[in-house]
Amino acid sequence: GRECRHRLWELAERVYPKDRPEYCLDEAERMLGERRLHSAGIAKHRSPWTPVGEAGELAVIEGSPRKYRVDPEALAALEDDPGGRVAFLNPYDGMLFDRPRLAELFEFEYVLEQFKPKAQRKYGFFAHPILMGDRFVGMLDAEVDRAEGALNVNAVHEFLPFDPEEDEMVRAEVEDLAEWLGVTLRAW
């Protein structure tokens, strides 16, 4: 914790429960790899960003020279997924972190524009990628005005024009976002 600007430290034995299990290094690395793969669903077989060791199953992606590892549970869940769900990804989402993987699997070149000069921005200061099913379809440029208690949607940038059903799905997700944030949605 902190006390003003000073960090406070504590001994591990006073923070963690006494009956916590202890693992050897190999077992701890294996468990960490499984946890990483479960979180990501898919990872490069040998990746410096998300090392998963031998967790999951080896997978070959058509057209890719790289080998991947997949979480079998995530793979099985795809069978039950009707697809088409819309999600706004936080610009710092782990899915966006490995840019080469993102470009290879989704053909999506992502650039966080908050550090670009305003004149060079294409989508907005903190635009959120819009994932629809298994493809990136646009960017949401929105911000919360806490003083007004409102979600302001500056723009929805469509990579290709949305059909009416896709437009309705994105609008519904924006409404859900405003509700989740506990603010009203300004007309856009």
Task: Enumerate the predicted regions with their spans.
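Long, charged, low-complexity, helical-prone intrinsically disordered regions
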Residues: 1-188
